[in-house]
Structure formats: structure tokens, C-alpha cells
A protein has these predicted regions:
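Conserved, mostly hydrophobic/aromatic
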Residues: 65, 88, 118, 183, ...
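C-terminal accessory subdomain/extension
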Residues: 2-6, 334-432
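Active-site loop ensemble at the mouth of alpha/beta enzyme cores that anchors a bound cofactor
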Residues: 270-359
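Active-site-proximal beta-alpha core segment in soluble small-molecule metabolic enzymes
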Residues: 84-228
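A charged N-terminal "starter" segment
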Residues: 1-143, 428-432
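Active-site loop/helix belt of alpha/beta enzymes
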Residues: 171, 186-311
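A non-catalytic, amphipathic alpha-helix used as a structural packing/dimerization or gating element
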Residues: 63-71, 203, 236, 240-243, ...
Length: 432
């Protein structure tokens, strides 16, 4: 399901990222690269280990990244799903371009600020998996939609009050194109956003129908918020979602829609989404079954390693962790204690602490980081417990596996993309 998008060419918004100058803003990059453009530095194909990079430095595996992109393209295609990966994970336009090149329908956003960034980099299809009731943001969206007939935008609605605020802002803006919305079905009591009952959803749909500024095109939600989730509970909620789509269609609520959107899917239950969406009966119009997983692009060595649906369906693929945070041993004050120069400012820690994986000595030899455990993080230090007999010296580099892609990307503005031997071939720019 490939779509037209801004090519990564020198004159495109993404291509112009290569013209940005390397300087003090980008931690970990070689000090002697100051003043070079990102493209010039990439062309030098420096070694991550001997090319002057300073620690800590986060690197993305080129091989793992490409593997993950291909895996989810195959998976979504095999299950007849359109794919709008959640861009909040990386906020990296270069990765958006690669996701689109691998067949993505568009990119999912979480807040209006994301949408503005996506548009600055030429994204033509955006699914905002959230409510938007900010008048200033809605005025901007109205201008953007009116100025570009090819721009497709969809947002959640979950309350008549939200619909009222959207309608007022869009009327004030003089919007000429209706803004497409999907009714969000909440995942259950105590869950996040979303109308809680089918009756609540119908009331929201009625409110949309009463406006001239909004167009109801489908239903959506996030199964990851199902309370005490397991396969049975998640599938039961997903069947509520598809039943809502069938009911709304039977009531001709999608009469103005070019296609009917049914959307769900984080990174923990996309197998359940695929199963239940496959059961959806034929509706009155074409159906866009839209999956929105995001963490897959880098995967991880912690939380998502344990919860990925590919653990349940290994014959359909496997994701590879793409992140490695390299830090240096700066202190060994006690026999069982060492400190690395990477901390909360550098590594995700909201779900799990980093996992030591490899020790690299100054002479370039590498060995497994057996006997090392990260026990805590300070702002700029990792606390390492060192088992007796473990060889670890001040000056050694330690590779850390990370847990939770969303809070790994956000700590780095420019991330080296490295091949297996450490050759850096590109730099991924993020916009957090």
C-alpha cells in the first residue's frame, strides 16, 4: 500500500537535513566534526569506536532497523491491514520516509505539534490518535486542509463537548473542507480516553452529524488500555469496536465517507487486532483496517522484547533490537562497584533499567558483559554492580541494551546509524 511521499532527495525537506551543521547540540558526535554538515560527516563513514565519537553515544543498528521495517511490512500486507506506524516513537522524519517506502499508509501522531512537524516534512496522510480541542491547532488544521487538497487527516472524537469545541473553532476559521473524525471507543473503566459505552459513542456520532465542519469516517481505539489485558479480554474489546463499526454502518452514519476507517493496534496486541479485523463483515463501503504500532521500528532489549506478539506467532516473524547505548567506565571506586558516564539524560529508565551486553576494551576486543548489572541511574551516571572475577577497567566501553523505544529516542537529537562493524553510514535526526 505504498503512497506518494516526499522523497529523501537533496531538495526535499528530509534531504535538507543532511545540510545541517554538526555542533555542540549533538552529543556523542566527534568534536573534530564541528562545522561539517551531517551529510559530509556521513560520507566519511567513520567508525563508531575509532572515529572520534565521545561517550555516551547512542547508535542504531542499520541491519536491525531495515529488518524490522521489512517484517512489519510483510505482516501488515499478509493480514490485509493498512499501516500507519505511530511516529511519536521516533519523531524522526528519515524513519518516516523509510516506513512509507515500506508500504505504510501514513503516519500516526499523538498531539497537534507532531502534525505540524509531519507536515513540515511532507507527510500527506496523518492519523491523530487523540482528541484535539485546541482552537489554535484547529485553526491551523483548517488552513492546512484548505491549502492542500491531497492532505488526508483523521482525528479522534470521544464527547459531544469535544465536538462542540471543534465545530466552533473550525467555523470561526472559515474551514472549507470538513475535518474527518473517528469515534474513539474507550478500552474500559479506568482506561484512558474514549467514550465508555456504545450509547456514549452514538451520542458523539450524533453530535458530529449535527455539524457542518466534521465528517464521521469510522471508529477507533487503543486495545493496549484494556484493563488487566490478556488475549481474551483484548479480543473481546476489539469485537466491541468492530461491532460498533457494523452498527454505525447499518445506521448510515458513514454515508458521507469515501471509505470506512476501523483502527486499533499498539505494539503488544497487533496479532489480536489482525485476528479480529479479519472477522469484520462486508460493510456498505470500502474499509480501511488501520494498524498503528510504533515501537517495532527500533524494538528493544526489555519491555517490548517480552511483550511482542511475535513471541506468540514466531512463524510470522521476529523483531530485532536496534539500539545500543555505548558508555565508558569512568570509576571503579570499590571491588564490586563501577560507574558509567551515561544516566537518566541518556537512557530510558521508565520501564526497565539498561542491560549491559558487551564490554569493549581500548584495544578493540569485545566480550560479553557477564557479571555486570545496572542497579540504578543518576542524571549522568549508571551504577554498575560488578561480580567478583569480572574483568572491567576504567576506560572500557560498555554497550547497554535499552527498554522502551519512545523514551530512548527522545534523549538524542542526532543518532548515528551504524553497521555491524561499527561503520556509521548516516545520522537520524529527531524532533522532540
Amino acid at each position: 500500500m505504498a503512497v506518494d511521499h516526499a522523497a529523501d532527495t537533496p531538495g526535499s525537506p528530509v534531504g535538507r537535513l543532511a545540510h545541517e551543521r554538526v555542533d555542540h547540540r549533538f552529543k556523542g558526535l566527534p568534536p573534530d566534526a564541528e562545522g561539517r554538515t551531517v551529510g559530509e560527516l556521513a560520507a566519511e563513514r567513520r567508525s563508531l569506536f575509532t572515529g572520534g565519537f565521545t561517550t555516551p553515544v547512542l547508535a542504531l543498528s542499520a541491519e536491525a532497523l531495515e529488518h524490522n521495517l521489512a517484517v512489519m511490512e510483510r505482516y501488515s500486507t499478509a493480514h490485509g491491514l493498512a499501516f500507519a506506524p505511530h511516529g511519536k516513537t521516533s519523531l524522526a522524519p528519515q524513519l518516516f520516509e523509510r516506513q512509507l517506502a515500506h508500504g505504510a499508509w501514513g503516519i500516526t501522531a499523538a498531539v497537534p505539534g507532531h502534525v505540524r512537524m509531519y507536515r513540515a516534512f511532507g507527510i500527506q496522510r496523518i492519523f491523530l490518535a487523540n482528541e484535539v480541542v485546541d482552537a489554535a491547532a484547529l485553526r491551523w488544521l483548517a488552513r492546512e486542509l484548505d491549502a492542500d487538497p491531497g492532505f488526508r487527516f483523521i482525528a479522534y472524537v470521544d464527547s459531544p463537548r469535544g465536538v462542540e469545541l471543534m465545530d466552533a473553532a473550525l467555523r470561526e476559521a472559515g474551514a472549507r473542507r470538513p475535518l474527518d473524525v473517528v469515534v474513539e471507543l474507550g478500552a474500559g473503566p479506568g482506561a484512558r480516553t474514549g467514550a465508555r459505552t456504545e450509547a456514549d459513542c452514538a451520542a458523539v456520532a450524533d453530535a458530529v452529524a449535527a455539524t457542518g465542519t466534521l465528517r464521521l469516517v469510522g471508529v477507533a481505539g487503543y486495545e493496549g488500555e484494556v484493563p488487566k489485558p490478556d488475549g481474551e479480554r483484548v479480543r473481546a474489546w476489539l469485537r466491541r469496536l468492530t461491532a460498533l463499526a457494523v452498527a454505525f454502518d447499518g445506521e448510515s452514519r458513514f454515508a458521507d465517507a469515501d471509505e470506512i476507517v476501523v483502527s486499533a493496534g499498539g505494539s503488544a496486541w497487533f496479532d489480536a487486532v489482525a485476528d479480529v479485523f479479519a472477522e469484520l463483515p462486508e460493510l456498505s463501503g470500502p474499509v480501511l483496517k488501520l494498524l498503528r504500532s510504533g515501537a517495532y521500528v527500533s524494538h528493544d532489549d526489555g519491555h517490548y522484547r517480552h511483550i511482542t506478539p511475535f513471541n506468540r506467532v514466531p512463524d510470522e516473524g521476529a523483531l530485532h533490537p536496534a539500539f545500543r547505548l555505548w558508555a565508558q567506565v569512568v570509576s571503579r571506586p570499590e571491588p564490586g562497584q563501577a560507574f558509567l558516564n551515561a544516566g537518566k539524560r541518556d537512557a530510558a529508565y521508565d520501564l526497565d533499567l539498561p542491560e549491559p551486553q558487551v564490554i569493549r576494551s581500548p584495544d578493540g576486543t569485545e566480550r560479553p558483559a557477564t557479571g555486570l548489572t545496572v542497579t540504578g541511574l543518576s542524571d549522568q551516571h549508571a551504577w554498575l554492580a560488578v561480580e567478583e572475577g569480572t574483568s572491567l577497567e576504567v576506560g572500557d566501553w560498555v554497550a547497554l541494551g535499552l527498554s522502551h523505544p519512545c523514551t530512548s529516542f527522545d534523549k538524542w537529537q542526532l543518532i548515528p546509524l551504524a553497521e555491524a562493524d561499527g561503520t556509521v553510514t548516516d545520522y537520524i535526526r529527531t524532533f522532540f
